[in-house]
């Protein structure tokens, strides 16, 4: 297992300078204010802003500490964020988190210098440990067709991003919180649920992995699970994936501590990161 990721949530873009009318007359002794620069390298300090465009449509505004209305991504950059994560749904209601919406947000992020993580859910809505629903358009597929659908969807979205000029894609998640796999199906010959068909899960992961490398060869591919504090569950999942020829570059761990356990959860997660590496 080559790398580790503890729920890093990422963003990316190339800095955009805007020059407005500045006086250059001899009697103007004012010194133009320098554009602030931001270090967007190093340890990934990220945020998932997948809901941003929908929130903006609903009139939501964001304010800095001085009470000044500020565009959300600019505000995040000012506060030290250097990476953005954007989730992708296959055919979502209203188009939110669909391909076009993701491209729009990714382009905005790149213009601000953020690094990007693209998070494929392979579903029309949320994919999480209790819900890995097959997209409506993929219902009834065979395992081979499902594998091809994963590859095609992944390549389609990433190619569209690249064609738009988005170059700062540093990480790609193939699946979201896949503690027991993804693309669950009542047909055990097709399901990607690990507890029922680990070989299919590995095949679907590999289809996504290979598609990522076709478009962004240098991007790190993440297999993402929750319960970062649970070493037994983590080793079970990644061992199943490894035993079935699964490929990944980075282990992505989510952690959801509560008030009464945050310290032990954090310590366990850090220990698990070292163990899994």
Task: Describe each model-derived feature in a short phrase.
Residues 44, 168-169, 248:
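Core-facing hydrophobic residues within beta-strands of well-ordered domains
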Residues 70-73, 77, 218-220, 232-277:
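Glycoside hydrolase catalytic-domain groove-lining segments
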Residues 56, 60-67, 90-100, 179-183, ...:
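Acidic-and-aromatic substrate-binding clefts and catalytic sites of carbohydrate-active enzymes
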Residues 1-10:
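Bacterial N-terminal signal peptides that target proteins for export
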Residues 35-72:
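Boundary/entry segment of secreted carbohydrate-active catalytic domains
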Residues 15-38:
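Bacterial Sec-dependent N-terminal signal peptides
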Residues 73-197, 201-228:
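Substrate-binding cleft and catalytic face of glycoside hydrolase catalytic domains
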